[in-house]
Design a protein with these regions (language model features):
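Beta-strand/loop nucleic-acid-binding surfaces
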Residues: 20-34, 90-108, 115-120
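OB-fold (S1/OB) nucleic-acid-binding surfaces
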Residues: 9-12, 17-24, 79-97
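Flexible glycine-rich surface loops and low-complexity tracts that mediate binding to linear polymers
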Residues: 4-6, 37-50, 107-125
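Beta-strand secondary-structure signal
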Residues: 15-17, 41-43, 74-76, 87, ...
Length: 126
């Protein structure tokens, strides 16, 4: 995923501020060395408790896929495996999540909103 690093990870919490197509968000940098400000490609993971119907809900119509300023994510469902692992597609990125609970009726291409998470980013191809 292409992002613009606005502020490097200076503190022990390794929080960086990034700009995406959808706005500015604070995320956790997981690279070995702090990133330099500027445009870069990253991979991301979503961390936190994920439950269908609580943290993973249908997105309102008209939403665009991507990282939101509030730290949530909107993504298109790319598939759900028999073990419950869901593949979510955002511009330039596919993220795997394993929400618990009863899966609502969703289809490939439907948008979901994932809230109450922390987003970790890594340098691409690490």
């Amino acid at each position: 995923m292409r992002v613009f690093i606005l502020s490097p990870a200076l503190g022990s919490d390794r929080i960086v501020t990034i700009r995406t197509e959808n706005g500015v968000a604070r995320v956790v940098w997981k690279g070995a060395t702090p990133p330099s400000p500027g445009e870069t490609n990253v991979e991301l993971t979503l961390r936190g408790r994920l439950r269908w119907g609580t943290e993973v809900v249908p997105a309102p119509s008209g939403e665009r896929a991507g990282i939101r300023e509030d730290g949530s994510v909107v993504a298109a469902v790319d598939g759900v495996d028999s073990d419950g692992v869901a593949r979510l597609r955002m511009p330039g990125e596919v993220v795997m999540i394993a929400p618990t609970g009863r899966q609502p009726p969703i289809s490939v291409g439907d948008l979901v909103h994932v809230v109450g998470i922390e987003i970790d980013i890594y340098p691409e191809n690490v």
